[in-house]
Design a protein with these regions (language model features):
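Compositionally biased terminal segments of proteins
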Residues: 1-157
Length: 157
């Protein structure tokens, strides 16, 4: 899970700057099901101005390319920020299909890993987002998530 030192450094800076974020996408799928290849770290952030300022400050400290960007860009619901190259690319999104950040934030899962806290979207919110997306890879992820959910339910019996 998140073996890249760059990913860990970025998430530690998000913690330092009190960024409200959730790991979504492939790394979240792996948290709830089985390992799979992912070309990036997908992060959903709250798009309020206070959080946008914190995101910008964390990215600046990280050394991210921010030419022609301001913190206001991170308040735009349709904005998408990308840095790096696969498999170490980071995608920062202000919205994902089928989910409101505030609702997902209330359901977040906190994972303690390698002396750091990582904030993940909940499995149920991830499933809801994958259902809303409809992309072919999301359909595959959705099947794996639902299978893992069924296995977890059996383990609880």
């Amino acid at each position: 899970m998140l073996t890249s030192s760059d990913f860990r450094e970025l998430l530690n800076l998000f913690e330092k700057h009190k960024v409200r974020y959730l790991v979504v996408g492939g790394y979240a799928v792996m948290k709830y099901s089985e390992p799979r290849f992912t070309k990036d770290l997908d992060i959903l952030i709250a798009s309020d101005s206070e959080n946008a300022n914190a995101v910008y400050a964390a990215l600046k400290e990280f050394g991210a390319p921010l030419a022609n960007l301001t913190s206001d860009d991170f308040t735009q619901q349709d904005y998408f920020y990308q840095m790096g190259r696969p498999p170490l690319r980071v995608d920062i999104m202000m919205s994902i299909p089928g989910i409101r950040f505030e609702d997902a934030w209330g359901n977040r899962e906190v994972v303690e890993f390698d002396n750091m806290r990582i904030l993940f979207i909940s499995r149920s919110d991830l499933i809801q987002s994958k259902e809303a997306s409809g992309r072919p890879l999301d359909k595959i992820d959705l099947d794996k998530l639902k299978q893992a959910e069924q296995l977890d339910a059996l383990d609880e019996e």
